[in-house]
């Protein structure tokens, strides 16, 4: 797999029926090794090992209901009272981060209303501090 702009780590890879799988420490199971999953596992490791977030406050593939449609946030970071604090959206390293990607994560944030949005393809990383504004009352 491609070298990323993230710290390297010792990952667990398995081969089954000609397909590669990588161990997801948050979901505690092997998942298909796709380019996007490669980015997810590296970024998750960065949050856990290098930034010190407890694994109990991170979750992968969190389902939300957006206007009657089921969607999945790639990774959600929670604070200690288990309120969502950050959404991370991953793309494969060869995917260019465009406005459409930010539109996607912003739609997810309409449901979770977090403080921080992160978008990464493993090469380029973007973090946004998000403030939820309300209209003034009379």
Model regions: which residues?
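Short, charged, amphipathic alpha-helix that recurs within catalytic cores of restriction-modification
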Residues: 83-87, 91-130
């Amino acid at each position: 797999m491609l070298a990323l702009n993230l710290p390297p780590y010792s990952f667990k890879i398995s081969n089954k029926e000609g397909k590669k799988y990588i161990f997801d420490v948050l979901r505690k199971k092997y998942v298909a090794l796709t380019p996007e999953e490669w980015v997810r596992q590296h970024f998750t490791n960065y949050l856990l090992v290098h930034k010190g977030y407890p694994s109990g406050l991170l979750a992968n593939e969190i389902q939300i209901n957006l206007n009657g449609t089921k969607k999945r946030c790639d990774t959600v970071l929670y604070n200690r009272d288990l309120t969502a604090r950050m959404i991370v959206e991953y793309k494969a390293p060869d995917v260019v981060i465009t406005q459409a990607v930010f539109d996607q994560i912003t739609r997810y944030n309409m449901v979770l209303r977090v403080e921080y949005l992160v978008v990464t393809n493993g090469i380029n990383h973007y973090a946004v501090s998000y403030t939820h504004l309300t209209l003034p009352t009379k």
